[in-house]
């Protein structure tokens, strides 16, 4: 008999290095403890992730680590660690405002409203951050889920061929390519094995929007506070030009530098 695939009541987050955690992390941590009392909370770090193995194995991970691009180191780590585990990954700036158990048990109105499209048990959930992109501030997965395997394979080869590097764009690309996600941006894929929640569930306000209490809806379970540090010049020079070669790479880097300093002067 095959092992039953379930999403465990475990919360995972990534933290690299010995730097002091920001205040937003502790606010979110308290929300996890308060609203998810039955969930185990696990930190993914250098002690429980085989850094040496992956630094040797994956060039992109190694270069990000050497350049201290911790956001992208974290992206890679979350995918690989969660592939071997079952539970819910959350960013350190993802506040949880309601118990997620009804989602895991598929006992919310969303599933009832989509019942004509569902014939299988949910094995992976994630959410849209806007009308176009899937975001990765929170996702739930069963162990050895094929979606995360596809993402891992992207990091092995396609990462050097495609002009994308942020994990929302990587997930969106893989969903479009492998799971036939159309421009309609479906919520149910593979007869219910994959669920992509509308933005109101976890991203009630967008990256370029200002938070107001009015954005919280009855179906909102989390608030992503968008506490990122993605845009250093060092990061841009590496990430935006990684897929190019020769003169194209040189020209791209010149444009990146010019754009960066023009922005700084404004």
What do these predicted regions represent?
Residues 75-87:
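Small-residue hinge/turn detector
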Residues 1-74, 90-266:
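Glycosyltransferase-associated regions of secretory-pathway enzymes
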């Amino acid at each position: 008999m095959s092992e039953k695939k379930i999403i465990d009541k475990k919360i995972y987050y990534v933290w690299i290095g010995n730097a002091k955690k920001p205040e937003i992390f502790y606010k979110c941590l308290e929300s996890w403890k308060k609203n998810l009392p039955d969930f185990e909370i696990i930190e993914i770090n250098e002690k429980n992730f085989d850094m040496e193995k992956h630094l040797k194995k994956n060039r992109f991970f190694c270069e990000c680590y050497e350049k201290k691009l911790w956001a992208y180191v974290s992206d890679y780590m979350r995918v690989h660690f969660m592939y071997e585990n079952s539970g819910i990954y959350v960013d350190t700036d993802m506040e949880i405002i309601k118990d997620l158990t009804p989602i895991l048990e598929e006992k919310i109105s969303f599933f009832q409203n989509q019942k004509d499209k569902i014939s299988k048990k949910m094995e992976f959930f994630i959410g849209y951050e806007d009308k176009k992109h899937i975001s990765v501030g929170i996702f739930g997965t069963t162990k050895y889920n094929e979606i995360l395997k596809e993402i891992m394979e992207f990091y092995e080869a396609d990462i050097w061929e495609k002009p994308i590097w942020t994990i929302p764009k990587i997930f969106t690309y893989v969903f479009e390519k492998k799971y036939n996600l159309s421009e309609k941006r479906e919520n149910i894929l593979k007869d219910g094995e994959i669920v992509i929640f509308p933005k109101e569930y976890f991203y009630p306000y967008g990256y370029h929007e200002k938070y107001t209490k009015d954005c919280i809806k009855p179906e909102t379970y989390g608030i992503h506070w968008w506490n990122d540090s993605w845009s250093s010049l060092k990061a841009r020079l590496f990430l935006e030009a990684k897929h190019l070669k020769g003169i194209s790479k040189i020209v791209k880097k010149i444009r990146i530098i010019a754009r960066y300093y023009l922005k700084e002067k404004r």
